[in-house]
Amino acid sequence: MLMPSHADCPADMSSPDHLKKHGKRKTVRENEMKKKRIMALLLCLGVVASGCGRIDQKASVQKTEHGFQGLEKQETSEDAPDVSAIAGGDAKEVLMVYMVGSNLESDSGLASADIEEMQQCGFDDDDLKVLICTGGTDSWWNPDIPDGECAIFELTEDGLDQVASLGDRDMADPQTLSGFVDFAYQSYSADDYSMVLWNHGGGAILGYGADENYGYDALSMRELDEALGSTDMAADGQKFEWIGFDACLMGMIEVADVLSDYSDYMIASEEMEAGDGWDYSFLRQMTDYGYYEGRDAASCVLDAYSSYYEDNYRYVPDYTLSCMDLTKTDAVKEKLDAFVLSAKQELKDGGYSKIAKIRDQAKSFGKVSEDTFYDTVDLYDLSDKMETLYPEESAELKAAIDDCVVEQVSNVPMTHGMAIYFPYENKDYVDEWLDIYGDIGFSDNYIGFVRNFTATLSGDPITDWHVEDTAPEEDVTAPGEYYVQLREDQVENLGHADYQLWMEDDGYEGTYILWMLSSDVSLSDDDKLYTNFDGKRFFLNDAEGGSVVCCALEIESGEDYKKYEIPLMLWRKDADLPENVYAHVRVDAEHPDGEVIGFYSEIDTDSTLFPQKNQVVLNEGDGVCPYLFAREIQFNEDGSVTPFSEWEPNSGTGAWITLSDDYDISMQEPDEVSNYCCLFRITDTQGNQYYTNPVYIEK
């Protein structure tokens, strides 16, 4: 069964006390329109998912000094509480939840599930007032929440009590958010205020929230700043105790910098959030222990988050969540400025590739495949790897980050709780994204450094490679080991390299199937690039003795681990059609043959611009087969083989296996070895890729 949508993918690779302390612009109109054009282009190209919901013009929102014009209390019953009466008694804290339901709700009911989780956790609704602003989705699974409008609810032990209606509003309009904050602040008196921003997140560039009813419109960082800065809280000098993002990729210094004028702490994830998001049982912990201040509340949030994923999943997904002290962001920016001023001088002195090599190795986030779309990296890890170039500046920046990130939970290596935008892999959108980035109002020195860096990144190749006429050679002193010889200038501008292992398909002459793509290569002192292939491949096994070989594509590597993506076709026992899923397998010292860390859906081209990371559960009796990528050898007129890049791509599926309850994916020696070919793919420090010719190895 052929799946042409995948054919080119691999070949071209287009009491929580135990928690540890880790340690301006172009015109607004021009940049906002540019952001919209980029989103539209991405949706059309299918690089990320597109929104096919109802697309309307933005409603005309008129905001008065008392919130929205026409904002009315919603009488849900004769006994519905009067808003002014609610405001009469002071609470310890008011928690505002800005819940943009989006496709997360219309497709899967995830927002409704989180509301139920909040309600059932048993928090004290006298001390903690939870107000939820709902909207941004085509339909709600919870029948108490109206479709087609934004509504405000108070959550009590008895359920949702609608206290106001905003009408049909775009939740990505700054006035919708500021109106909700004003309503809560004016109507509910409390010692402290906090807020959760719930939905999709795309980091500092793409912003937060995706209103399904308005073409997946999102709040940019400038718009988030505008929304919070225009509230009555801001006018009164009243800060939030904490603002948290139950959304992907928002744990960035740029986001923290925007929020620093409005909140004492920020809680957010550097990485894509695991499928179920936050565990809202933390509300009970807050009220039980009186943990309302930002630092204490963050401990509750982080503890519940990590415990939930460690305790409730067969395969524990990657998770990160951190709390930043927003009074310390200026110190981070100050040390970052000193850091990049040295780096800018390095660029002037011709040291681009030195910096690019380090950027290539830094921990990045948002990887849904081998390529990184979002171009965010862990700032501490980046600085740590830069220490060989700038020891003093690096040490001071790391100390500032360590001081700002007051708590962190993570099972992901090389994460320290604070990310930053550093364009490198996503070259196609560098220019336009930098215009959006400049509109945020972050560090001028850092933006200048990034612009200088990307000028070389997108410029003419520094080095002439011409490796397409070169094939790996067998080392005569070490039979079975293969290498390609590099020149000195090539080594200086080598970003990274990987090898591809293609096995001959015994059923189709001249066709080779990809079994492995791995960066497990090494560079010798005499500039020879070696493979470290040990003969093992990945197999899907079950307890009944079934076993089938799989294609494994490395998507991430660190100093002591590698992560592979294994494409599979899943046919559930009660389904009419199969679905594409991806197994993620981590290989490290503790699990040298691999450990499954989750199964994930194929990127949904009918979804939003933002990443999703919902786990797929495989059940006993489901059918699974590997998805295979192949290439057919092409010949020149004289009978010689063309360069590998000209081979005809193809794809299909392998043998099916019916799962028992106990199954795994692991690396092992195959019982039979076929003829295969091996080649290198070299990526230079400017992101350009080059393939060597293959070497053929007979069994």
Located regions from the model:
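Terminal, contiguous helix-loop blocks that mediate binding/assembly
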Residues: 62-90, 186, 208-245, 250-699
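Sec-dependent signal peptide cleavage junction
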Residues: 49-63
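N-terminal extension/subdomain marker
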Residues: 59-189
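Structural recognition of the beta-strand scaffold that forms the well-ordered cores
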Residues: 94-99, 129-134, 193-197, 241-245, ...
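Catalytic-core segments of thiol-dependent peptidases
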Residues: 134-236, 247-248, 253, 270-271
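Short, Lys/Arg-enriched N-terminal segments with co-localized hydrophobic residues
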Residues: 18-32
